[in-house]
């Protein structure tokens, strides 16, 4: 039996009232009532503040974007000569940045602006580590309407805005066109996983003589990817990690979906699991297809061109229960630390809105494959140079909100990865593993949520 984290159950988490109503695609949890108790300045008070002369920006440089981030910082400093920005490498991924930001909370110096992933911004908000930025945005002359409505809506909580979208992405289906051609299958992404399962044995057979060839399909490395990308297979077969606040990881449909995943590796043998980076495996010609972030698009196409390899991209495949809206969004936003001075917070607001404006987001999108987050962004030049980018933009229209078990239960994503490791790498019994996962997620609720409930 699944646990239902209803509005009544979840009332009071860090002073927030979190509704369990269904969310629209690409939107944060619906909320009403009181928000997290943080004192913020009014628009009139912000107007009397002078921005600090120096701030820091902690990033993992998502999508290998460090050079682009440096260019954006230089452009910001040129437009705001009184403010300098110190770029801090917080780690090689979102989790490492989160750990460093959390550690900094114990000291007197915290970074002013932080890249916050889809599984971290909410925790920062309810813990009071970041500042609601509604009035800050007004103070620097920016409106939430300046952003893609679905992406900016991801960061709405307790009737307040907690972040702006930055390096936002969706997974894409990447495939080697030459491998598909050799197998005599269509040079396109499969419409469903069932269709790909029909193609896969032929694809593997036709390309197995290639040096270092492994599999027709490579599941992404489990750490950081399993909880995110496996939602696609689950949703396509009518399953999920959770439905709103109900944990459904061991429902009949979820078990069937994950059994299909295990069978593709163990019984049918046309799929494998990457030990490090599935997109690198694809670029090396070791596999014929994989799923990876749209942020990998530019680098993958560049590598393919250099290797005289034809790489195609497409929507994520559907399944027997759903053929569309089976793609999650992902990536990160920018948050402003609550522990710094108003002067630094105002300078931070100037910076985050500059690096997410139409010109800046277009530059980041062109360099990586991340989604343009500004409503006024003109992607025509990107599509002209990289036609595959249109797929990224088009797929955004049919995305689905991620399961709460991954994004809003503290540590939930790591637990999903542990379960996936057992199922995909250790050949564990699927049903019992997912039942154990459900119990673990319930335990997270009991330990990390229930103690904070209001009496």
Q: Where are the regions a protein language model picked out?
A:
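Extracytoplasmic/periplasmic substrate-recognition and gating elements
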Residues: 74, 78-79, 181-183, 255, ...
């Amino acid at each position: 039996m699944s646990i239902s984290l209803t509005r009544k159950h979840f009332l009071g988490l860090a002073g927030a009232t979190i509704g369990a109503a269904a969310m629209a695609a690409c939107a944060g949890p619906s909320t009403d009532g009181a928000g997290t108790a943080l004192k913020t300045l009014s628009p009139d008070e912000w107007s009397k503040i002078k921005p600090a002369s120096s701030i820091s920006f902690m990033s993992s440089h998502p999508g290998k974007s460090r050079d682009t981030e440096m260019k954006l910082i230089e452009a910001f400093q040129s437009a705001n000569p009184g403010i300098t920005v110190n770029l801090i490498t917080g780690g090689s991924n979102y989790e490492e940045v989160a750990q460093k930001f959390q550690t900094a909370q114990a000291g007197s110096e915290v970074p002013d602006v932080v890249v916050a992933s889809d599984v971290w911004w909410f925790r920062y908000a309810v813990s009071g580590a970041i500042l609601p930025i509604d009035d800050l945005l007004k103070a620097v002359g920016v409106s939430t309407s300046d952003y893609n409505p679905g992406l900016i809506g991801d960061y709405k909580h307790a009737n307040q805005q907690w972040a702006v979208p930055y390096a936002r992405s969706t997974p894409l289906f990447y495939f080697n066109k030459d491998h598909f051609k050799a197998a005599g299958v269509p040079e396109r992404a499969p419409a469903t996983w069932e269709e790909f399962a029909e193609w896969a044995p032929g694809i593997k057979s036709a390309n197995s003589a290639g040096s270092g060839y492994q599999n027709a399909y490579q599941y992404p490395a489990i750490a950081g990817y399993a909880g995110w990308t496996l939602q696609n297979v689950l949703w396509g077969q009518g399953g999920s990690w959770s439905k709103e606040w109900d944990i459904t990881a061991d429902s009949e449909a979820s078990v069937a979906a994950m059994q299909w995943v295990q069978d593709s590796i163990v019984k049918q043998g046309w799929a494998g699991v990457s030990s490090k980076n599935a997109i690198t495996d694809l670029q090396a010609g070791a596999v014929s297809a994989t799923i990876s972030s749209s942020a990998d698009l530019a680098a993958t196409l560049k590598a393919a061109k250099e290797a005289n390899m034809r790489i195609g991209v497409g929507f994520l495949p559907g399944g027997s229960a759903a053929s569309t809206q089976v793609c999650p969004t992902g990536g990160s936003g920018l948050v402003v630390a609550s522990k710094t001075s108003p002067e630094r917070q105002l300078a931070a607001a100037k910076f985050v809105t500059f690096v997410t404006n139409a010109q800046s987001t277009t530059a980041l999108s062109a360099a990586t494959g991340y989604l343009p987050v500004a409503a006024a962004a003109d992607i025509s030049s990107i599509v002209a140079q990289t036609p595959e980018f249109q797929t990224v933009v088009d797929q955004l229209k049919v995305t689905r909100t991620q399961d709460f078990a991954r994004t809003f239960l503290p540590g939930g994503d790591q637990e999903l990865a542990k379960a996936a490791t057992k199922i995909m790498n250790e050949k564990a019994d699927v049903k019992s593993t997912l039942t154990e996962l459900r119990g673990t997620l319930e335990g997270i609720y009991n330990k990390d949520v229930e103690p904070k409930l209001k009496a």
